[in-house]
Amino acid sequence: MEEILIYMLIKHHYIWDEVYNALRQKEPIDIKDVKDEYIKLCCKYVTVINEKYPLYLHDVLKPPFAIFYVGNIDLFSKQRICIEGNIKAKNLKYLKYLAAQNFVLCFKQNLIDEEGTDLLIKNHLPFVIYTKDLQCILSNDKLLEKIDKKSCCFVSEIHDEKYAKSRGDFYNNRFFYGRGNPIVIFDEDIIVDIQNNCYLLDSKIPIYVIADNSKKYENINNSQMQKINNFNEFKIVFINKN
């Protein structure tokens, strides 16, 4: 059955509704076609019917039929915390603190650069990076040589780069945040974006902003902030009050 799910994803270009309808209508398949596509896979995966499929994804809207990954999928069985923005050396102590509290640190690949990834690797911090294009990870020999696959995981709903760019942010957001996982923001400039991201999820998500100072928050419009459906759980933690 797992092979069939993978085949349907590939056949229907990872479009959730099309895959769902094909399965519901019991679309005819040729087992030879299934096997031909299956052997082309160059990465690991777990499907929605696999016991290692992340539990939190069962509760999101349109849960992924499969996730493709490089690294340790068991990290999803631990408590996660979503980090918005890039990592800089000055934030390392906070990341170490979170890791010491047994949190797995989760990032979006488009928001974390090579320097940030290197900081995670060099300091042996457990992390998950969500990417639209897993092929760029699989083809990065330099990165694969550096990582400890027991303490990290790169994941995507798509393993074929041809379809990665057309993927909408909604799908990536519900995959990244899930339901109830706390969010930490190190870059206060990203706050405008986070409003829309969280509003899509329809769930209570605690959000914490680690800010250098309060100046950038003096002109925030409260009506805008109330777009965050968990407004009362929004907290700003200032490193230096000035």
Would you name each region that the model predicts?
Residues 1-50:
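Short, small/acidic-rich helices and loops at N termini and domain boundaries
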Residues 49-242:
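Glycine-biased, small-residue-rich flexible motifs in mid-sequence functional cores and linkers
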